[in-house]
Structure formats: structure tokens, C-alpha cells
């Protein structure tokens, strides 16, 4: 059965201008934010931006192998590498990268914005990973009306 890696092989040569953004593209961009691009994607929203291809090249030069932990699939770096090398995603501009883990407040928050060729912005939020902080935050959601990461997400937008 085909998967999103196969989709990148099949449709990676088509830009988002040639074929409109679709559900599979949405899934791919959502998955990209699971790779920790701290130091490789700019934190600000000013004019400093890098392409996905540039961020991947810098990341891979620093981390030729990556352990994604228990919950996040090991295929994420493969997905990002494939996406970065395509005409469809390689030139997407990254900005606003945040990766905040705070043991004291039991908060895990990560987000990134990707600029699409039509001028729209795609915002991706990372979910829980396998850190103790992430698990504690999940448990806190069961009995706390609002956790810090929810406030961070609202502020991010």
C-alpha cells in the first residue's frame, strides 16, 4: 500500500502552483514539524527565512543520524529529507520556529510557520513526544482547564 513517502516520489516534481495544495500535502507539512529544527529554522517572523531545503541540509550536516525516540516514527527524517528535495516543498520558506520544553511548568510547545507560494501561511504544531514533560502535560490536560501550551498556541497565531 502506498504511503506519504511514495506520494513524494510520485508528486514531488509538481510544484504547489502546478497542482493545488491537498490533504496529503497537509499531512506532510504537519509531520515535518516533528523534526527538531532548533537552530536551523529561524525563530523570528521578520525577513530572516530559510527554505526547507536549506534547513534540511544544515540539519543533516549536523545530525547525519537522528534518534526520534519511542513515539515519533523514525521515518520523520526520511520524510523531511524527501520533501526538502522536491520541487513541491523544497522552496517553502520557514520562519517562526519555536521549541519550548519547560520542566517546571510541565510544558511542551513547538510550532513553525511555512510560507506557501500563493502567499498563504501554513502553521504546524507538534504534538506530544516521548519526553517526561510531554507526558506530564498530557496528564495535566485531563484535569486542568487550560495548560500553558494552549496559551502559547493562541499567542503564536
Each model region followed by its residue ranges:
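Non-catalytic, mobile gating and regulatory segments of ester bond hydrolases
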Residues: 1-157
Amino acid at each position: 500500500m502506498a504511503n506519504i513517502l511514495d506520494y513524494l516520489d510520485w508528486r514531488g516534481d509538481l510544484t504547489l502552483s502546478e497542482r493545488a495544495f491537498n490533504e496529503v500535502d497537509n499531512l506532510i507539512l504537519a509531520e515535518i514539524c516533528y523534526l527538531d529544527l532548533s537552530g536551523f529554522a529561524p525563530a523570528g517572523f521578520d525577513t530572516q527565512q530559510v527554505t526547507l531545503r536549506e534547513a534540511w541540509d544544515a540539519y543533516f550536516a549536523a545530525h547525519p543520524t537522528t534518534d526520534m525516540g519511542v513515539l515519533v516514527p523514525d521515518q520523520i527524517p526520511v520524510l523531511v529529507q524527501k520533501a526538502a528535495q522536491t520541487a513541491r516543498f523544497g522552496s517553502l520558506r520557514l520562519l517562526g520556529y519555536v521549541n519550548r520544553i519547560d520542566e517546571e511548568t510541565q510544558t511542551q510547545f513547538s510550532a513553525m510557520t511555512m510560507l506557501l507560494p500563493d502567499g498563504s501561511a501554513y502553521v504546524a504544531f507538534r504534538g506530544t513526544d516521548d519526553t517526561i514533560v510531554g507526558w506530564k502535560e498530557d496528564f495535566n490536560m485531563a484535569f486542568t482547564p487550560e495548560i500553558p501550551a494552549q496559551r502559547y498556541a493562541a499567542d503564536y497565531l
